[in-house]
């Protein structure tokens, strides 16, 4: 019995030159899809196109564009349809961040992260829907994060952007359902992933930035995006047991999680190596303009290539059971590590 494979589709991916977006390009290419790959860095884009062609893409084109520019995004969507045909799937993955305490982030930096990591999703989804809705078909996949539910220290700008995406996506999904269209939008909440962003992110930390363990390979994330594109009726997917644990712990005991992250969230986001003073910085200019970093970061030896939770979550109804089991393990552990402080004695009235 042969495996069912969908007919080749036209797929647009933002942030496609590295990390999760790059891995998504390879995954869709292996299905024989037609790909429009959007990013700012020329070398990274060229590498992504060559990799997609080797993986089996029917056709792959590189489009240099900044998702913070709505006109550039609209032009990219127009070119994708002119060269590849009607867009069937649009994947939003482009983002930027700043690793620093909130008081050390400038207004310009905060605005830039918000424009790329939140408004970039808004502009790109708008460009996709302007084409999908008149045809009555199409899927938009938003690459999210556990940080969409649970902000973490040293990433206030990125945490705010991911929370904004979550609220906007929920509202948009309701509107699409109310309209009766077959166009769907779904979200994939990611764990920590081994991507190049930790080498090129703007950082004021004393040591090199790293994803909070456990770390997963970008191919895990790409498989989840591929599955979500094929099954967009579900509002969102959670990837990795750590994502499930974070979301459940935050829902059940957010105060405990505050204290836990206050104790662990600073060291866990840094390696033991000092941060290089002359490292690349992609906040305002692409770090991969002249160098192709690929999909993987520097944490291959630590990263996991499989996610048993992800495989289980594809089965209907299993996510709730997994969440209940995870909550049973996580909450007692948080309480042991972060005992509540004894409240001060109440004062009577004079």
Residues covered by each model-derived region:
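Conserved glycine-rich cofactor-binding loop
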Residues: 17-18
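Substrate-binding pocket helix/loop in short-chain dehydrogenase/reductase
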Residues: 101-102, 109-111
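The beta1-alpha1 cofactor-binding region of Rossmann-like NAD(H)/NADP(H)-dependent oxidoreductases
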Residues: 65-75, 107
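SDR active-site lid
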Residues: 177-275
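Residue(s) in the substrate-gating loop at a strand-loop-helix junction
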Residues: 145
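Conserved glycine-rich Rossmann-like NAD(P)H-binding loop of the short-chain dehydrogenase/reductase
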Residues: 31-47
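Active-site helix of classical SDR
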Residues: 125, 161
């Amino acid at each position: 019995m042969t495996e069912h494979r969908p007919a080749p589709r036209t797929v647009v991916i933002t942030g496609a030159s590295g990390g999760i977006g790059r891995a998504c390009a390879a995954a869709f290419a292996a299905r024989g899809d037609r790909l429009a790959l959007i990013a700012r860095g020329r070398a990274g884009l060229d590498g992504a196109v060559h990799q997609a062609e080797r993986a089996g893409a029917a056709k792959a084109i590189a489009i240099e564009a900044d998702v913070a520019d709505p006109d550039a995004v609209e032009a990219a969507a127009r070119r994708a349809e002119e060269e590849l045909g009607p867009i069937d799937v649009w994947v939003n993955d482009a983002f930027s961040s700043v690793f620093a305490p909130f008081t050390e982030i400038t207004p310009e930096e905060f605005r830039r992260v918000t424009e790329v990591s939140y408004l970039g999703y808004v502009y790109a989804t708008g460009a996709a829907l302007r084409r999908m809705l008149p045809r009555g078909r199409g899927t938009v996949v938003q690459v999210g994060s556990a940080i969409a539910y649970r902000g973490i220290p040293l990433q206030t700008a990125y945490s705010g952007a991911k929370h904004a995406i979550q609220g906007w996506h929920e509202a948009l999904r309701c509107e699409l359902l109310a309209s009766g269209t077959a166009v769907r939008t779904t979200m994939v909440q990611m764990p920590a992933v081994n991507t190049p962003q930790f080498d090129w992110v703007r950082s004021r930390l004393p040591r090199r930035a790293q994803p909070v363990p456990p770390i997963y390979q970008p191919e895990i994330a790409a498989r989840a995006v591929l599955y979500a594109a094929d099954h967009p009726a579900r509002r969102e997917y959670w990837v990795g047991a750590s994502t499930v644990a974070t979301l459940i712990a935050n829902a059940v005991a957010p105060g405990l999680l505050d204290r836990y992250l206050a104790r662990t969230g600073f060291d866990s986001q840094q390696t033991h190596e000092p941060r290089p003073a002359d490292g690349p910085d992609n906040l305002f200019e692409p770090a991969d303009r002249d160098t192709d970093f690929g999909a993987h970061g520097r944490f291959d030896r630590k990263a996991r290539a499989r996610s048993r939770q992800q495989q289980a979550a594809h089965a209907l109804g299993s996510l709730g059971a997994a969440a209940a089991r995870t909550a049973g393990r996580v909450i007692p552990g948080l309480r042991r590590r972060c005992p509540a402080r004894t409240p001060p004695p109440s004062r009577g009235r004079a």
